[in-house]
Every structure is written in structure tokens, then in C-alpha cells.
């Protein structure tokens, strides 16, 4: 429009106002790179309410510029004036759609399928295998629970709430804990002292036929020094029983 000078210009209604006219699309860019090649044609693609525009570039690898954006239906008052520099007239055209496109940075324009792409059949197989494994695990756990419930009703076993196993505890006797492997010295001393007393009584009973021996043995009391109260009581009672039995035998 740099060639437009001051003055009056004619405005002619365009073919877009007729019923059988071609449609007009208005595009608004966020910016247009300087490397766009205006000498070559681009490609415009439409998918539902979105547009994708490919414009050629001046790059050595011939990588195009990609623009993507949404579109909306134009209103009845949305129009555009097209200026003809030769005839010095404007043509008024009605706009059908308005698109706002944004340039993509480092767009992926490769036509090859990526190596990590998964097809629909692969997805279906994966989903079927997952569902099969899940159903198998669910079936096994359900059968196990049903068997445990049936066995518990028959009185055989009780259903277990977990898989944890604990060692069996015997109820035949009290539970003891060995804190020390060494024997009780006090018990051993009492046992040894009892054996000595029994041995002394046996010697006295064996020599009962000799009156002199009996009198000597009976007249000699057993020393209770260095003994505990329990040992003294045990020795005194044993000595008294031995003397009484010896006197009865003499009678």
C-alpha cells in the first residue's frame, strides 16, 4: 500500500457477495521469518477447526517454516479490501473464516515413522496381555480364598489373613529361657552334702552289730559349721533320724 496516494478511489463489490463465489480466508501471523522464500508456493492443511501452513524457506536443507493455529467463522461484517494498483480501484470481499497462526520453532517435519512409535495393533496386544495377567492373578487369589473359606466351614483350618508363618509353640510345659548354661552351684552343693550324709548313715547302719562302734558314732555329733541355714536344718533332721533308728535297734 505504499503506492497509495491521497485521493478518492472506487470500491467495487467482489464475487464473494454472490452465492457461487470462492471462499476467502484471513490469516494473522504472530511473525513471519525473513527466510521465507516468496518465489515458491506453500501448502495449507486443514483439520477440523485447525490450520497448518507450510511455507518454503531459503535454508540449505530446504527445511520449511511451519505455522499452526485455530480458526473461527467470520461475521457478516468481516470484510477485506483488495487494492489493484493498475486500475487504482478497491475490491470489497467478504471473509468466510479467520485463522490465527503461530510459527513453530524447530518443527518436526520428518516423514519417517519414529522408532518408538507403537501401532494400534501393538497397543491392543499390550492391553490384552495386561488384562489377561491381571485376570489370572485375580482368579488365583479368588480360588485360594474360596478354598480357605470352605475348609474353615468344615472345621479343618482357619482362613489366614496373611501369608506370614510363625513357629509353633508347644503347650506341654512352661516356656523357659536359658540365660546361662552354667549349672546352679548351690543345688550341686546341697546334692553333694546329702550324698555324704547318706554315706555316713550307711556306714553307721552297717556297723550297728558292734556296740562300741555305735556308741562312738552316736557320741560324735556332725559339725554344722560353715553350712547355710538350709543345710543345717537338713543335717540336724537327718542326724536325729539316724540316732533314733540306732537306739530302736539296740532295744
From Swiss-Prot:
Polar residues bias (residue ranges): 112-123, 204-220, 236-251
One function term, GO molecular function aspect: transcription elongation factor activity
Skewed-composition ranges (Basic and acidic residues): 143-157
A cellular component annotation (GO) from this entry: super elongation complex
GO biological process terms on file: transcription elongation by RNA polymerase II
Keywords: Activator, Nucleus, Phosphoprotein, Transcription, Transcription regulation
Subunit record text: Forms a stable heterodimer with ell1. Ell1-eaf1 complex interacts with RNA polymerase II.
Protein name per its UniProtKB record: Ell1-associated factor 1
Organism: Schizosaccharomyces pombe (strain 972 / ATCC 24843)
Amino acid at each position: 500500500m505504499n503506492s497509495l496516494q491521497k485521493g478518492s478511489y472506487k470500491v467495487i463489490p467482489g464475487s464473494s457477495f454472490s452465492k457461487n463465489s470462492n471462499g476467502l480466508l484471513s490469516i494473522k501471523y504472530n511473525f513471519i521469518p525473513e527466510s521465507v522464500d516468496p518465489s515458491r508456493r506453500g501448502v495449507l492443511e486443514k483439520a477440523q477447526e485447525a490450520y497448518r501452513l507450510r511455507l518454503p524457506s531459503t535454508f540449505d536443507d530446504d527445511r520449511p517454516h511451519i505455522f499452526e493455529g485455530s480458526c473461527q467463522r467470520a461475521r457478516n461484517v468481516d470484510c477485506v479490501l483488495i487494492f489493484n494498483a493498475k486500475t487504482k480501484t478497491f475490491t470489497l470481499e467478504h471473509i468466510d473464516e479467520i485463522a490465527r497462526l503461530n510459527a513453530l520453532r524447530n518443527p518436526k517435519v520428518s516423514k519417517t515413522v519414529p522408532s518408538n512409535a507403537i501401532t494400534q495393533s501393538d497397543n491392543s496386544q499390550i492391553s490384552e496381555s495386561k488384562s489377561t495377567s491381571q485376570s489370572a492373578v485375580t482368579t488365583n487369589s479368588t480360588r485360594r480364598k474360596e478354598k480357605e473359606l470352605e475348609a474353615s466351614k468344615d472345621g479343618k483350618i482357619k482362613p489366614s489373613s496373611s501369608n506370614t508363618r510363625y513357629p509353633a509353640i508347644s503347650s506341654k510345659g512352661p516356656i523357659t529361657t536359658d540365660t546361662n548354661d552354667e549349672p546352679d552351684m548351690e543345688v550341686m552343693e546341697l546334692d553333694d552334702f546329702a550324698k555324704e550324709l547318706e554315706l555316713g548313715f550307711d556306714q553307721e547302719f552297717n556297723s550297728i552289730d558292734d556296740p562300741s562302734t555305735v556308741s562312738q558314732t552316736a557320741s560324735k555329733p556332725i559339725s554344722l559349721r560353715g553350712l547355710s541355714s538350709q543345710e543345717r536344718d537338713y543335717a540336724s533332721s537327718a542326724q536325729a533320724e539316724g540316732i533314733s533308728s540306732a537306739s530302736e535297734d539296740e532295744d
